[in-house]
UniProtKB/Swiss-Prot annotation:
It is a single-pass type II membrane protein. The modification O-AMP-threonine is found at residues 77, 180. It comes from Cricetulus griseus. Residues 1-20 are cytoplasmic. This is Protein adenylyltransferase FICD. Belongs to the fic family. TPR repeats lie at residues 103-136, 137-170. It is found in: Endoplasmic reticulum membrane. The fido domain mediates the adenylyltransferase activity.
Length: 455
């Protein structure tokens, strides 16, 4: 056979063998890559959590202009106010280099204006520095000193605490905080004493008082209205009263929203008739029973059950589902501990609310359940249940966020303020020339009876 023919015949065989070898090599590499991907599957949950946290951080950066802030004393600043002139700062976003430079320049100008005695200008410049860079520790400390000089001890202490949250070993802030902390604790205790005196006045109102009975009835409807409105429910006060009195639906309104009202009513009835006067510890089962009623008319599958999925709540990542039950057990132990019982009732109730909503044990209804637990603690201590108004929603969420960042005292003060407002309302409504709460109109004109809301 000619050589050319041999080569012509052998070449395809050589190409075929080489092709198979190449494919086997590629297949081995692919299998190796697949094996490398499969090996870490045992830790897939931790990886998912890391991804969630990364996504959460990215979202917070993208949304840095959409942070919820409460009303300010000055429209030119993003510092929110809870009581007095306490500014609440959030440092969830990374400040740009240009922002840091502007903040430093503003701080230097503020100190110069302060030295010259131009305190109003200095105040605005301090605010501007912190607006540009909320995590500027030196500005926080210097503004704290300025606030002390203005006799605003609570704001000064908050600013020092904020600085130490960011930089725990900042020497000047440590010294300043050591000076203001006992003063602030005294101020808080004095405020609790004022609340206690008002509680005694409310307790002295005759139980048969028709005015007290009337205002308590209206307060009941108002509480349901505001607590569901905070979560986005659009029903009016009159519509809520119609639903609870007739058990008939309001036409044109979401049945889910109406069932939220029925659930809140059922949960409040359960607390009032079963838990308030009961002697003994508050248990996990008690909280599950409250939640079962809160959510039972909207989502009976999830009602009274701990969540089984990871959730994100604003900037807060609650505990992993596998840790929820353990954390709830620890929370319940604290709830019934001597340390908790020795707290002022308002402080105890506020901390219980915060701790439960921090764990976020349920897929939905955590806020409503936390507010009900808070009121259960207050009522067991002889206080009336309090209402957080829907108009306070931004402030309410903001002080919760500040608590997540390490300072729960603004949230406690917020709850104390709500408690005092509730007490003042009861006292005002039971005086001779009282102005009671605006009543929900009993004549439901235009509200036709339709299919009953699920009982």
């Amino acid at each position: 056979m000619p050589m050319a023919s041999v080569i012509a015949v052998a070449e395809p065989k050589w190409i075929s063998v080489w092709g198979r070898f190449l494919w086997l090599t590629l297949l081995s590499m692919a299998l190796g890559s697949l094996l490398a991907l499969l090996l870490p599957l045992g830790a897939v949950e931790e990886q998912c959590l890391a991804v969630l946290r990364s996504f959460h951080l990215l979202r917070s950066k993208l949304d840095r202009t959409q942070h919820v802030v409460t009303k300010c004393t000055s429209p030119s600043t993003e510092l929110s106010v809870t009581s007095g002139d306490v500014g609440l700062l959030t440092v969830k976003t990374k400040t740009s280099p240009a922002g840091k430079l502007e903040a430093k320049a503003a701080l230097n100008q503020a100190l110069e204006m302060k030295r010259q005695g131009k305190r109003e200008k200095a105040h605005k410049l301090f605010l501007h520095a912190l607006k540009m860079d909320p995590g500027f520790v030196d500005a926080l400390n210097e503004f704290g000193i300025f606030s002390e000089e203005e006799k605003d001890i609570i704001q000064a202490d908050y600013l020092y605490t904020r600085a130490l949250t960011i930089s725990p070993f900042h020497e000047k802030a440590l010294v300043n905080r050591d000076r203001t902390l006992p003063l602030v604790e005294e101020i808080d205790q004095r405020y609790f004493s004022i609340i206690d005196s008002k509680v005694k006045k409310v307790m002295s109102i005759p139980k048969g008082s028709s005015a007290l009975r009337r205002v308590m009835e209206e307060t009941y409807y108002h509480h349901i209205y505001h607590t569901v409105a905070i979560e986005g429910n659009t029903l009016t006060l009159s519509e809520i009263r119609h639903i609870l009195e007739t058990r008939y639906a309001v036409p044109g309104k979401s049945l889910e929203e109406q069932n939220e009202v029925i659930g809140m009513h059922a949960a409040m009835k359960y607390i009032n008739t079963t838990l308030v006067s009961r002697i003994g510890s508050v248990t996990i089962d008690d909280m599950l029973e409250i939640h079962r009623r809160v959510l039972g008319y909207v989502d009976p599958v999830e009602a009274g059950r701990f969540r089984r999925t990871q959730v994100l709540v604003g900037h807060h990542i609650p505990p992993h589902p596998r840790d929820v039950e353990k954390q709830m057990q620890e929370f319940t132990q604290w709830l019934n501990s001597e340390d908790a019982m020795n707290l002022h009732p308002v402080e105890f109730a506020a901390l219980a609310h915060y701790k439960l909503v921090y764990i976020h044990p349920f897929i939905d209804g955590n806020g409503r359940t936390s507010r009900l637990l808070m009121n259960l603690i207050l009522m067991q201590a002889g206080y009336p249940p309090i209402t957080i108004l829907k108009e306070q929603r931004s402030e309410y969420y903001h002080v919760l966020e500040v608590a997540n960042e390490g300072d729960v005292r603004p949230f406690i003060r917020f709850i104390a303020k709500c408690t005092e407002v509730t007490l003042d309302t009861l006292l005002l409504a039971t005086t001779e020339y009282s102005v009671a709460l605006p009543e929900a109109q009993p004549n439901h004109s235009g509200l036709k009876e339709t299919l009953p809301v699920r009982p």
